[in-house]
Each structure stands twice: as C-alpha cells, then as structure tokens.
Curated annotation (Swiss-Prot):
One GO MF term: pyridoxine 5'-phosphate synthase activity
EC number in record: 2.6.99.2
Sites where the protein binds 3-amino-2-oxopropyl phosphate: N6, R17, G212, G233, Q234
Top EC class for this record: transferase
Pathway: Cofactor biosynthesis; pyridoxine 5'-phosphate biosynthesis; pyridoxine 5'-phosphate from D-erythrose 4-phosphate: step 5/5
Main localization category: cytoplasm
Family: Belongs to the PNP synthase family.
Site, Transition state stabilizer: residue positions: E148
Record-given protein name: Pyridoxine 5'-phosphate synthase
GO biological process, one term: pyridoxine biosynthetic process
Gene Ontology CC terms, in alphabetical order: cytosol
InterPro entries documented for this protein: Aldolase_TIM, PyrdxlP_synth_PdxJ, Pyridoxine-5'_phos_synth
Oligomeric form and interacting partners: Homooctamer; tetramer of dimers.
Amino acid sequence: MLLGVNIDHIAVLREARQVNDPDILMGMYAAIIGGADQITTHLREDRRHINENDVKDIINHSRVPVNLECSINEEIIDFVCKFRPHRATLVPEKREELTTEGGLNLSTAGLENIINRLKNEGIKVSLFIDTSRENIDIASELAVDCIELHTGTYANIFNMLNSNIALTKYSIKNYEKSREDLQNLLKDELANIKHLAAYAKGLGLKVAAGHGLNYQNVASLTKNSEIFELNIGQSIIARAIFVGMKTAVCEMKELIK
C-alpha cells in the first residue's frame, strides 16, 4: 500500500508565527527520504497554510508524485492547470472549517467540465467522496482516475472507542455512546469502507483513503483491502515533532506495508 504524506501542517506551524521556518521543502525532502510514495498538499482558497509559492516549489522539486487537493474554485483550477501536479484531488471547502469535513457534492454544477479540463492538461483526477455506492457510481460515470474515500467517520468512532478523547473537551458528540455501540459502529464502518473499495475497483477506479488516519487506526484498513493508497498528514507531522520526519514516515510505512 502506498503512502501519501500531507505536509500542510508544516505550513500551519510556519504561519502560526508568520515566519519562514519551518521550511516546507526541508519537510518534503525528509518525508521522501523516510519513504513517502507521494506528497499531498491542499491549496485552500483562504491560503491559511499552503500558498501558491509553496505549491510551485513542491511540484518543481519533488521526486515523487504530487497530489494537490483543491476546491473547484475557478482561480484555483486555473492555477492547477498552469502548474500541473501529478494528480488533483477535488475536495469541498468551507472557510469556517478547521479541516475538510466531508466529501465533495458530486452534483455540483460544472464539475464534469472541470474534470475534463484537468484531464486535458494531463493531470490525473481524483474525487474526495463520502462512503456511499451512489457516490462511487457517479465518480465512475465522470470517468475520473481515482477516488479517495473519506475515512473521517471511521477515525472518529475509533478515537472515541480507543482513546480518552471522550473525557476531554474534544469529545465527539455524535459518538458519545456505549462501548458496545461504538464497537458495532466501528465494525460496520470498516466493513463498509472495504466493501466500497472493492466495488469501486471493480468499476475500474483506483481507490485511496484518508482523513483522520493515524498510527493507531491504519492497520485495520490495510488488511484484505482494495485500497491502494492512504493519504495521512496531521498524525505524521505530530509524531515528527518527537522523532523527526524521516522516522515518523518510516514508522507509518511499516504499519501499512
């Protein structure tokens, strides 16, 4: 299974003090040395962390494929077409959200035209989608190269079941349930992800997954799964604070191999 390392949170740390440190390219190089198969980054409309110069540098200097997450905003798509990353993953975006909260609405007007424009530029296209067969069917009809299944629900249930988050201010209200209920929900969500990955592969789609994945919850996703790639960011950057980026990526690679 391949690992895409999302390096956005290096820029989050930089922007916290609005200085030029840490260097996004140094982080990228360390991730690649650690075994990253792909560099993933998200150019948001509000440029809250990664900016255009970062993306240009990443595309120009990465020796592994670059997966650029982006909204379908016209200005952003113009930029993507100009600098041509290996892949563009189309995601929904809200200014007020801390991170991407759900999958892309595949009935959005103009989506097919944007996909075709990107493909005409030689850019592979992926759609970040919620876990439903209907979304996969639509993605197949749109003739994209890849889908990325939103694993946020799985990650949230896992976290509430297997950590102390329920006892903190970060408790996830929707999953304040009994341990037995959480175990059943987790089993069902994991089975659903694996079933949908197999279904999508049967339609000729490559299947990636991501959102909320960490060193504790990835192992279950890798067993008997048709998912070919995981995109993971915050947990790797957080681990890197203590062990360094190279080691943090190596450890994740070991877990998903």
